[in-house]
Amino acid sequence: MLLRESGIIKPYASPELAKYPEEAKTKADASRVHWVTDREAYLGFGYNTRMITSAQVPKNFQELLKPELKGKLAVTTESSSARVIGSMLKYKGDGFMKTLKEQEVRLFKLASLGFLNLLIAGEIAGSPTVFRNQVIVMKEKGAPIDWVPLDVAVANAGGSAVIANAPHPHAALLLTDFVIGGEGQKLMEQFRYGVAWKEYPFKREYPERGMTTAQYQDAEEKWSQLLRSTTQR
């Protein structure tokens, strides 16, 4: 948002754009975009399989309130956690957030991978703010963890754009074509990222969609405050 509003990036066209859904493109005009989503990381419920049984795993936001999960949940201070809180507020409302506070959710000042390592070690039993791609990688290495989507899977999306004053604009366009094309997207999948034009068995949520930079900053601050007031340190 800020890059577009500041004029740092410029509109571009690519033959690869046709396969991308409209929601994955920030349109500049009828044929050009400011950027297109080239990778997505999805946030959902990650849990230690030795500490939470299959019967206890929540299938939606409401089931985070199960009595057997009280005192077992945690989140981080990362902005990604605030985005999940924003989605909970959107779909479940203030009353749900007040009840969630009674679950004694712990708050950790950690980046996502450090937080995941606590989950693997059993310091944390489960969290609704865990990245699917990170769980897949660690699960493949034998870690006792798994991941499920809830009502929505909040997407952290990365995009490909062209810098306005790129010294070699044609090379920049070729690189962008590669990244958003078939071969580039295969590379993204090797890192277990999601692909914007593929279907997944969950609904994706983009909290920032339709907002200006200022609107999103205000919303994220509100969500962060709600995150802190709902959790325990």
What are these regions (language model features)?
Residues G44-I52, N156-H168, L187:
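A bilobed periplasmic-binding-protein/Venus flytrap-type ligand-binding module shared by bacterial periplasmic
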Residues F96-L100, P167-V179, L187-M188:
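Short amphipathic alpha-helical coupling segments at ligand-binding clamshell hinges
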Residues Y193-R233:
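An extracytoplasmic/periplasmic, membrane-proximal ligand-sensing/linker region
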Residues A41, L69-T76, T99-K101, R106-K109, K141-A166, V179-E199:
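Periplasmic-binding protein-like
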Residues M1-L2, A125-P144:
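A ligand-binding cleft/hinge motif common to bilobed small-molecule-binding domains
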Residues M1-I120:
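Extracytoplasmic ligand-binding site segments that recognize negatively charged/polar headgroups
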Residues F115-L118, Q134, A172:
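Short, hydrophobic alpha-helical packing/hinge segments within bilobed ligand-binding/sensory domains
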